[in-house]
Amino acid sequence: MPPPELTVQPLDSGATFRNQVYRRLKQAIIQMDIYDHPGDVRLDERQLSGLLGVSRTPIREALTLLEQEGLVRLEPRRGIYVVRKTKTEIIEMIIAWAALESMATRLAAERATAEDISTLWDIFRSFEEQAPSDNIQEYSDANIEFHKAIIRLSRARILETLTDNLFIHMRAIRKLSIRQDNRAEQSMHEHRDIIRALERRDGELAERLAREHTLGLAAHVERHGDFLDWLRLAEVRGPDVKAALKDGLPLM
């Protein structure tokens, strides 16, 4: 299995290099499938400098900011690594997300316009005549877009801020787990129930459905997420654990 691809967007003019590099790297890390690869997820300063067309100084400054946020780990004489979480940490993050997103859903029932809510249906329009499992990659992207939209429709900037760093891991775990246990079809059904509750402006029901939906992911990780501890262990213990992963330890 090839390592996750790092796709970095070009810089804009008018902002400091450090801040631009920070934003571009953070977005690139969000888009990586960091739990779908048994090896370390390593970043290379020289490669980043070439991709962004800047010196290594703003790269290092941006990486320091990302390290302070707990997104990367800088190891002297070894390199820069994207931080992956243990099974327990992921479950705790999902529970925190469930609390924040369920509140966002209640607020969306009060604050979102009818047009806003209709855009949630648009996200899944292409699945009206095909099952989500028929195009799992497209559905995975739609699933992630849906959850980001719910937070946005709350009109609560603080919720967007609080969920920002959680989203890096939530996105990767959702993308990985959606392929398992018929979760795509179940997810589609639950999304529709949430949208209908929003249309009825039933904030209490929408909040409960959103919370139960996300806690279902926590239960799934509890059952199938032991590999997360192996991935984390591989980062610490090195080649022996990595070899065990490559020899067939099942990913979720």
Label for each model-derived stretch:
Residues 2, 168, 172-252:
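C-terminal all-alpha effector/ligand-binding and dimerization domain
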Residues 43, 100, 122, 186-189:
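Alpha-helix N-cap/N′ positions at the starts of helices
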Residues 61, 67-68, 74, 81-82, ...:
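Short leucine-rich amphipathic alpha-helices used at interfaces
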Residues 93, 111-175, 188-197, 205-216:
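Conserved amphipathic alpha-helical segments that form helical-bundle/coiled-coil interaction surfaces
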